[in-house]
From Swiss-Prot:
Its EC number is 4.2.1.47. InterPro entries: GDP_Man_deHydtase, NAD(P)-bd_dom, NAD(P)-bd_dom_sf. The lineage of its organism: Eukaryota, Metazoa, Ecdysozoa, Nematoda, Chromadorea. It comes from Caenorhabditis elegans. This is GDP-mannose 4,6 dehydratase 1. SUPFAM superfamilies: NAD(P)-binding Rossmann-fold domains. Keywords: Insecticide resistance, Lyase, NADP. It catalyses: GDP-alpha-D-mannose = GDP-4-dehydro-alpha-D-rhamnose + H2O.
Length: 399
């Protein structure tokens, strides 16, 4: 497995059917964090020509799509996954052509690591020497952040700092291009509609507050150390690979189960919440384009169209031939089918202590500067997700 340095610094093991690298060796970065250098253009060009990407959060929705994209473009892709008692690599297992016999010439490698462990991050950066870093790892569930605020800050805020500082400590500040997955939750209690790169932030959750620190520390390293460090302020983006606890996937999974007679109804929170939903596959293309631009900058990535959770439900149930009729208000609101069977209920337990009522992005800057524009519509997205979940639930009702 490639590590970018000596073979002796890499120890590998096979876990399940995936080979994971445990990187050792910190010497290259000791005492370097305060040195300043100007990298010659030829050296910089040769470094970047290697096309080596490091992805944190590679086992998630975005990480898996991004890995596919980068591999298709000829990159060597390294991903960081956390060691745990259970496997969470289902979204990326297909990227291994022959995982058991997979050796050093592979284009795809996984490494154990954690955003709370700075020494581990320094070792990985030192050994891999990535040309591009895509920082997607986070505790990204807004409601969970109210239950785990300190952990959310440790991973989402300080974790971003640790990764940036690992690059700086290894004297790769002027060579590595860094992408930080920022979020539309920064806008929270929105100050204008739609939201652009110039809209003031007003975070409304521990998650959003932690991500705001992440946003500004990226800007700080860009300005302080001349690092090619960028924020992608991504509005909600979904896919069949979306985590099961997020509202869109919760809806499409439940609709699939209902269509197969495995479930009767679904409980949700704020049905009136308005969101700008896009497809994750398109959004990772924007991430890549951000790092190919001539200069580092921050970009809103969004569709510019808005739907409520209620409308998302309507679209999902329409895919199984059911038209919902809505009755009541607030926690008393229900959605019934034509036979009067309640399909959607509202439960107070899914409300957040501070709600974000509306998010709508203005991605004109990305369109003009990067040539990026969302193409998949919400009805198309819902159709794909419901169809995928029906296939999943047919084969494995307990999934």
């Amino acid at each position: 497995m490639p590590t970018g340095k000596s073979e002796s610094s890499d120890i590998s093991e096979v876990v399940g059917n995936m080979e994971i690298s445990k990187v050792e060796g910190l010497e290259a970065c000791i005492g370097m964090s305060h040195e300043v250098s100007t990298t010659p253009a030829a050296e910089l060009a040769a470094f970047r020509a290697r096309k080596v990407a490091l992805i944190t959060g590679i086992s998630g929705q975005d990480g898996s799509y991004l890995a596919e994209l980068l591999l298709s473009k000829g990159y060597k892709v390294h991903g960081i996954i956390r060691r745990s008692s259970s496997f969470n690599t289902a979204r990326i297992e297909h990227l291994y052509s022959n995982p058991i016999t997979h050796h050093g010439d592979s284009s795809f490698s996984l490494h154990y690591g954690d955003m709370t462990d700075s020494s581990c991050l320094i070792k990985l950066i030192s050994t891999i020497e990535p040309t591009e870093v895509y920082h997607l790892a986070a505790q990204s569930h807004v409601k969970v952040s109210f239950d785990l605020p300190e952990y959310t800050a440790e991973v989402d805020a300080v974790g971003t700092l640790r990764l940036l500082d690992a690059i700086h400590a290894c004297r790769l500040t002027e060579k590595v291009r860094f992408y930080q997955a920022s979020t539309s939750e920064l806008y929270g209690k929105v100050q204008e509609i739609p939201q652009s790169e110039k809209t003031p932030f007003y975070p409304r959750s521990p998650y959003a507050v932690a991500k705001m620190y992440g946003y500004w520390i990226v800007v700080n390293y860009r300005e302080a150390y001349n690092m090619f460090a960028c924020n992608g302020i991504l509005f909600n983006h979904e896919s069949p690979r979306r985590g099961e606890t997020f509202v869109t996937r919760k809806i499409t999974r439940s609709v699939a189960k209902i269509s197969l007679g495995q479930q009767e109804s679904i409980e949700l929170g704020n049905l009136s919440a308005l969101r700008d939903w896009g497809h994750a596959r398109e959004y990772v293309e924007a991430m890549w384009r951000i790092l190919q631009h001539d200069s580092p900058d921050d970009f809103v990535i969004a569709t510019g169209k808005q739907f409520s959770v209620r409308e998302f439900c309507n679209l999902a149930f329409a895919e199984i031939g059911e038209v919902l009729q809505w009755e009541g208000e607030g926690v008393e609101e229900v959605g019934k089918n034509k036979d009067g069977v309640i399909r959607v209920k509202v439960s107070p337990k899914y409300y957040r202590p501070t709600e974000v009522e509306t998010l709508l992005g203005n991605a004109e800057k990305a369109k003009k500067t990067l040539g990026w524009e969302a193409k998949v519509t919400v009805p198309e997205l819902v159709k794909e997700m419901v169809a995928s979940d029906i296939i999943l639930m047919k084969s494995n009702p307990m999934a």
